[in-house]
Protein backbone atom coordinates (compact mmCIF):
# COMPACT_ATOMS: atom_id res chain seq x y z
CA UNK A 1 0.00 0.00 0.00
CA UNK A 2 1.29 3.45 -0.72
CA UNK A 3 2.41 5.61 2.16
CA UNK A 4 0.87 9.05 2.75
CA UNK A 5 4.05 10.86 1.71
CA UNK A 6 4.59 8.72 -1.42
CA UNK A 7 1.29 9.33 -3.24
CA UNK A 8 2.87 11.73 -5.72
CA UNK A 9 5.17 8.97 -7.02
CA UNK A 10 2.11 7.16 -8.33
CA UNK A 11 1.17 10.04 -10.63
CA UNK A 12 3.70 8.76 -13.18
CA UNK A 13 1.54 5.71 -13.91
CA UNK A 14 -1.42 7.64 -15.39
CA UNK A 15 1.16 9.35 -17.62
CA UNK A 16 2.36 5.93 -18.76
CA UNK A 17 -1.26 4.99 -19.45
CA UNK A 18 -1.70 8.22 -21.42
CA UNK A 19 1.26 7.25 -23.59
CA UNK A 20 -0.40 3.87 -24.17
CA UNK A 21 -3.62 5.61 -25.18
CA UNK A 22 -1.75 7.93 -27.54
CA UNK A 23 -0.02 4.96 -29.18
CA UNK A 24 -3.37 3.19 -29.57
CA UNK A 25 -5.05 6.26 -31.06
CA UNK A 26 -2.11 6.96 -33.37
CA UNK A 27 -2.22 3.40 -34.69
CA UNK A 28 -5.95 3.71 -35.42
CA UNK A 29 -5.59 7.19 -36.94
CA UNK A 30 -2.85 5.99 -39.29
CA UNK A 31 -4.98 3.03 -40.38
CA UNK A 32 -7.97 5.32 -41.07
CA UNK A 33 -5.74 8.08 -42.51
CA UNK A 34 -7.61 10.63 -40.43
CA UNK A 35 -6.70 12.60 -37.30
CA UNK A 36 -9.05 14.41 -34.92
CA UNK A 37 -7.76 16.64 -32.14
CA UNK A 38 -10.91 16.03 -30.11
CA UNK A 39 -10.65 12.22 -30.39
CA UNK A 40 -6.96 12.47 -29.52
CA UNK A 41 -7.71 14.51 -26.39
CA UNK A 42 -10.55 12.21 -25.31
CA UNK A 43 -8.34 9.15 -25.80
CA UNK A 44 -5.53 10.71 -23.76
CA UNK A 45 -7.80 11.79 -20.89
CA UNK A 46 -9.67 8.47 -20.74
CA UNK A 47 -6.38 6.54 -20.82
CA UNK A 48 -5.06 8.66 -17.94
CA UNK A 49 -8.23 8.05 -15.92
CA UNK A 50 -8.16 4.30 -16.54
CA UNK A 51 -4.45 4.25 -15.70
CA UNK A 52 -5.12 6.03 -12.43
CA UNK A 53 -7.88 3.57 -11.50
CA UNK A 54 -5.69 0.58 -12.35
CA UNK A 55 -2.82 2.12 -10.37
CA UNK A 56 -4.99 2.69 -7.31
CA UNK A 57 -6.36 -0.85 -7.52
CA UNK A 58 -2.89 -2.31 -7.92
CA UNK A 59 -1.52 -0.23 -5.05
CA UNK A 60 -4.37 -1.49 -2.86
CA UNK A 61 -3.25 -5.04 -3.72
CA UNK A 62 0.37 -4.14 -2.84
CA UNK A 63 1.70 -4.65 -6.36
CA UNK A 64 5.25 -3.51 -7.01
CA UNK A 65 5.85 -0.33 -9.02
CA UNK A 66 6.99 -2.48 -11.94
CA UNK A 67 3.63 -4.28 -12.07
CA UNK A 68 1.77 -1.00 -11.60
CA UNK A 69 3.63 0.56 -14.52
CA UNK A 70 2.97 -2.43 -16.76
CA UNK A 71 -0.71 -2.58 -15.80
CA UNK A 72 -1.20 1.17 -16.27
CA UNK A 73 0.52 1.20 -19.65
CA UNK A 74 -1.40 -1.83 -20.90
CA UNK A 75 -4.69 -0.42 -19.66
CA UNK A 76 -4.04 2.83 -21.51
CA UNK A 77 -3.07 0.98 -24.66
CA UNK A 78 -5.94 -1.53 -24.56
CA UNK A 79 -8.52 1.12 -23.71
CA UNK A 80 -11.31 1.65 -21.23
CA UNK A 81 -13.66 -0.92 -22.81
CA UNK A 82 -11.10 -3.70 -22.35
CA UNK A 83 -10.43 -2.69 -18.74
CA UNK A 84 -14.18 -2.56 -18.02
CA UNK A 85 -14.60 -6.08 -19.43
CA UNK A 86 -11.72 -7.44 -17.34
CA UNK A 87 -12.98 -5.67 -14.22
CA UNK A 88 -16.50 -6.99 -14.84
CA UNK A 89 -15.17 -10.56 -15.04
CA UNK A 90 -13.20 -10.01 -11.84
CA UNK A 91 -16.28 -8.74 -10.01
CA UNK A 92 -18.40 -11.60 -11.38
CA UNK A 93 -15.84 -14.13 -10.11
CA UNK A 94 -16.18 -12.62 -6.64
CA UNK A 95 -19.99 -12.35 -6.69
CA UNK A 96 -20.95 -15.54 -8.56
CA UNK A 97 -20.27 -17.95 -5.66
CA UNK A 98 -22.85 -16.07 -3.58
CA UNK A 99 -25.52 -16.26 -6.29
CA UNK A 100 -25.03 -19.92 -7.22
CA UNK A 101 -27.79 -22.36 -6.29
CA UNK A 102 -27.22 -24.21 -3.10
CA UNK A 103 -29.22 -26.43 -0.75
CA UNK A 104 -32.93 -25.80 -0.23
CA UNK A 105 -33.62 -23.17 2.39
CA UNK A 106 -35.91 -24.85 4.94
CA UNK A 107 -37.58 -21.58 5.94
CA UNK A 108 -39.08 -20.77 2.58
CA UNK A 109 -38.35 -23.90 0.47
CA UNK A 110 -36.59 -21.84 -2.20
CA UNK A 111 -33.34 -23.12 -3.67
CA UNK A 112 -30.35 -20.90 -3.13
CA UNK A 113 -27.67 -20.12 -0.64
CA UNK A 114 -28.42 -18.41 2.59
CA UNK A 115 -26.13 -16.57 4.93
CA UNK A 116 -26.49 -19.46 7.40
CA UNK A 117 -24.93 -22.04 5.04
Swiss-Prot record:
Transmembrane segments: 6-26, 40-60, 67-87
Record keywords, A-Z: Antimicrobial, Bacteriolytic enzyme, Cytolysis, Host cell inner membrane, Host cell lysis by virus, Host cell membrane, Host membrane, Membrane, Transmembrane, Transmembrane helix, Viral release from host cell
Keyword Transmembrane (UniProt): yes
Primary localization: host cell
Any one GO molecular function term: catalytic activity
Disordered: annotated segments: 97-117
GO biological process: defense response to bacterium; viral release from host cell by cytolysis
A Pfam short name: Phage_holin_3_3
Keyword set includes Metal-binding: no
Bilayer topology: Multi-pass membrane protein
InterPro entries (UniProt xref): LydA_holin (IPR032126)
Annotated compartments: Host cell inner membrane
Compositionally biased residues, Basic and acidic residues: 107-117
One GO CC annotation: membrane
Described function: Isoform Holin: Accumulates harmlessly in the cytoplasmic membrane until it reaches a critical concentration that triggers the formation of micron-scale pores (holes) causing host cell membrane disruption and endolysin escape into the periplasmic space. Determines the precise timing of host cell lysis. Participates with the endolysin and spanin proteins in the sequential events which lead to the programmed host cell lysis releasing the mature viral particles from the host cell.
Subunit and partners: Homomultimer. Isoform Holin: Interacts with isoform Antiholin; this interaction blocks the holin homomultimerization and delays host cell lysis.
Stated name of the protein: Holin
Species for this entry: Enterobacteria phage PRD1 (Bacteriophage PRD1)
